[in-house]
Regions:
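Long, compositionally biased low-complexity segments
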Residues: 65-480
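Alpha-helical assembly-interface signal, strongest on the long, hydrophobic N-terminal helix that forms
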Residues: 1-78
């Protein structure tokens, strides 16, 4: 009995030792697996850094936008797998990994998600560059424009009131003792019909390169010259202007407009550039030729200035009196109060529009103009309206051509278009260096998966827990 008890005790201790050994082996196996996974992840992350470094160089150098080079996309899976093997060999792999398949998926290119991918990168880049003083300065300028735009309805009400008062005395024909004068609006209208580019640039050379529109939407609208001989036509133009987009959301659009002025060329930019010259003008106008884009931007700048100048001219009693006398003189013996009132207001509006043309000429020459004018800042007289000849009065402190480009960019109705048009410009400019470059092949975000096999730890020739290899699958989302 004693021997049996001793044998049972020995067997029990042996089993206890075996259980203890198994527990130790499981713990060691767990530590081994944990360490191996950490090692594999470190090598995997090193491979990710390598792949992320294969970005499109020209895109990064010219625009500070990062995306995978399309040429690398074709070989990324093989390259990543080879990189993993190389790193394992160089680091003296004690875990005896076996590399499996590499797969890239969930790809987003720079043109994806309706421009949101490009927008995200621009915002990330510009978030520290929208300094407080820039924001404050722009806010002040935009507010001045918005305040005067709001006064446009007041001008329309004043015109209507004057004409109604004149109609009450329409039977009292008023003859003028002065000789009949030539209507300056006729000469002015002739100049307007020539188009905004010759009106502003004169004989200066203007680029007319074509723009290849791939991502953006071509703007097919046309700008016609205002007819200051017809009241209804002018009223229609005033109504259309009131419908233009507001700049209420300018804070949210500020990063992209600052990015645009930093990385894209425009008329008064003094830096030399090959290829497209009026890039920001294209972002605004969306035409397929440089000259058309410049012309459309000129018309829109004239319209912006017109509102401010109209407010100024209607606040000047001397100009109102001069316009009334000129209207009566133009109409001569056929003049009567309603017609004189209409002609007077059309003359005042024509003068404000002519002054706006002079303003844009100053802007196109790289000079500044006052945001809000007074009578002392005024340049054009009724005598010079037909030929637009006057002494210009640019200022040192005021708004520049670039400032008005910012206003036009911010006030775009379809705010996504500026991103698509940026894509067009980026692609066309980079193609001067890389002929087959396509922006929609540049990958901004992707998922990369890697399969590995890990040889399990063995004890005395026995593999625990009874399988030679275990599968490891690693993946990460990569975003530039």
């Amino acid at each position: 009995m004693i021997r049996d008890e001793q044998g049972s005790m020995s067997a029990f201790l042996a089993m206890l030792f075996l259980v203890f050994l198994l527990l130790i082996s499981v713990c060691v196996e767990g530590i081994y697996m944990y360490t191996a996974r950490g090692k594999a992840m470190g090598i995997y992350m090193s491979g990710l850094s390598h792949t992320k470094g294969n970005y499109q160089k020209e895109l990064a150098d010219m625009y500070h936008i990062y995306a995978m080079d399309p040429r690398y996309h074709k070989k990324i899976e093989i390259d990543f797998s080879d990189r993993m093997k190389e790193s394992l060999d160089q680091n003296g792999d004690p875990f005896r990994f076996q590399t499996g398949s590499t797969k890239i998926s969930d790809i987003l290119d720079l043109s994806a998600q309706k421009g949101e991918v490009l927008k995200y990168q621009i915002r990330q880049q510009m978030q520290y560059e929208a300094a407080g003083d820039i924001l404050k300065n722009l806010t002040k300028k935009i507010k001045a424009g918005e305040d005067q735009k709001n006064e446009l309805s007041g001008i329309k009400d004043q015109i209507q009131k004057e004409e109604e008062e004149a109609e009450e005395t329409e039977n009292e024909k008023t003859l003028t003792s002065e000789p009949v004068k030539k209507d300056p609006r006729k000469g002015f209208m002739k100049l307007l019909k020539e188009g905004s580019v010759p009106l502003i640039m004169g004989e200066k050379k203007v680029s007319d390169l074509p723009i290849n529109i791939v991502y953006g939407k071509k703007d097919t609208t046309k700008q016609s010259a205002w007819n200051f001989m017809n009241r209804k036509d002018v009223e229609k133009e005033l109504d259309e202007f009131e419908k233009t987009a507001s700049t209420d959301s300018f804070a949210s659009e500020l990063p992209v407009v600052l990015y645009a002025t930093k990385y894209f060329h425009f008329l008064t930019d003094t830096t030399k550039k090959d290829g497209i010259k009026y890039e920001i003008e294209y972002l605004i106008a969306g035409k397929d030729s440089e000259k058309e884009n410049l012309g459309m931007v000129f018309w829109r700048m004239i319209a912006l200035r017109f509102v401010m100048n109209a407010v100024c001219v209607y606040q000047d009693p001397a100009k109102e009196k001069e316009a009334a006398l000129l209207a009566a003189s133009i109409l001569g013996v056929t003049g009567f109060p309603p017609a004189v009132a209409v002609a007077k207001n059309l003359l005042l509006l024509a003068l404000a529009y002519g002054e706006s043309v002079i303003d844009v000429r100053n802007l196109a020459d790289g000079k500044k103009i006052p945001a809000v004018k007074t009578s002392s800042d005024w340049q054009l007289s009724f005598a010079g309206l037909a030929t637009l000849n006057c002494k210009r009065k640019p200022v040192n402190q005021g708004m520049s051509y670039e400032d008005y480009l910012l206003l036009l960019l911010i006030s775009q109705k379809d705010k996504r278009q500026k991103y698509f048009r940026m894509m067009d410009l980026m692609e066309q400019n980079i193609r001067r260096k890389v002929s087959d470059f396509k922006l929609d092949q540049c990958i901004s975000s992707y998922k990369i998966s890697q399969n590995l096999k890990l040889k399990k730890l063995g004890f005395g020739g026995m593999i625990l827990p009874f399988a030679t290899y275990t599968d490891l699958k690693m993946y990460r989302y990569v975003t530039y």
